Amino acid sequence: MYAVFQSGGKQHRVSEGQTVRLEKLDIATGEAVEFDLVLMVANGEEIKIGVPYVDGGKIKAEVVAHGRGEKVKIVKFRRRKHYRKQAGHRQWFTDVKITGISA
């Protein structure tokens, strides 16, 4: 059984027991979280596709950890003008473990 849900402006395909890295959620580590923006649920041959969301579709998960991703370097440069700028960015994330899928 697997499902596709929406979180943080992105879509994720998950199955039970899987750990997924999402955009930062303001929920403490170890707490349960429930996602109700389920786009699709598949159980063997039976597939439910939402318009846009599946009625009664829920994904239960547990927050495992919070952290920051790898640094991305941003460089602005203009040739012959002695103009260079550098910046860096590290995006916050939340790791969640999927504990249940229902539709």
Curated annotation (Swiss-Prot):
UniProt similarity note: Belongs to the bacterial ribosomal protein bL21 family.
TM spans (from-to): none
Name of the protein in its database record: Large ribosomal subunit protein bL21
Organism: Pectobacterium atrosepticum (strain SCRI 1043 / ATCC BAA-672) (Erwinia carotovora subsp. atroseptica)
Function statement: This protein binds to 23S rRNA in the presence of protein L20.
Molecular function GO labels: rRNA binding; structural constituent of ribosome
SUPFAM superfamilies to which the protein is assigned, alphabetical: L21p-like
Annotated Gene Ontology cellular component terms: cytoplasm; ribonucleoprotein complex; ribosome
